[in-house]
């Protein structure tokens, strides 16, 4: 779906570049093969010293195959499409691109971030898409109308700023619950059997 939408965008905006960040870096080979199979040029970020390497043809697609670069990519992006929202796995982090004042596009499955998704939609800092056609329409619209793209990104960032206090309150409440659970843990619960897991 994303590649189809990108190819349609290229027809109107030939300089547009797609940066893909697979959730599992070990999938980079499969993603690269799929992109090449669609007739697009592709490079891995780990093999490009700088994204704007002089003297080399600019690839259509760059696969982010190293950790810790997503924030810098969001900072330079025009629009962000957040994956993991096209299939029922709960969705990925919608706040990162919003923090960097980028319009946030995402699919219908946002179980892990329902409130954030709703707040983004209400602020018109984010939009839900369900099909390749809908994604294409939104991408083309935002590229065709940069002023709308900027306004939408600012709305996304404003939503994050307005809700920072609520986010901290939620984190504090979770911390209190964890302390309470730890203090009341059953004696039959051995060390390490109740792990706190955090992930993106």
Residue map of PLM features:
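Nucleotide-activated sugar donor-binding and catalytic core shared by glycosyltransferases
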Residues: 1-200
């Amino acid at each position: 779906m994303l590649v189809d939408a990108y190819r349609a965008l290229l027809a109107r905006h030939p300089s547009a570049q797609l940066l893909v960040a697979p959730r599992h870096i070990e999938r980079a080979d499969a993603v690269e093969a799929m992109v090449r199979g669609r007739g697009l040029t592709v490079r891995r970020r780990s093999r490009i010293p700088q994204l704007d390497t002089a003297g080399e043809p600019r690839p259509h697609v760059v696969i982010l195959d190293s950790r810790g670069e997503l924030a810098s990519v969001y900072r330079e992006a025009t629009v962000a499409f957040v994956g993991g929202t096209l299939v029922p796995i709960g969705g990925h982090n919608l706040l990162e691109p919003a923090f960097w004042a980028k319009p946030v596009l995402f699919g219908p499955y946002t179980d892990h971030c329902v409130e954030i998704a709703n707040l983004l939609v209400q602020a018109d800092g984010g939009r839900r898409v369900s099909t390749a056609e809908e994604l294409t329409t939104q991408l083309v619209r935002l590229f065709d109308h940069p002023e709308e793209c900027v306004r939408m990104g600012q709305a996304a960032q404003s939503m994050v700023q307005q809700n920072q206090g609520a986010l901290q309150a939620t984190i504090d409440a979770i911390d209190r619950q964890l302390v309470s659970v730890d203090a009341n843990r059953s004696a039959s619960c051995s060390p390490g059997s109740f792990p706190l897991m955090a992930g993106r």
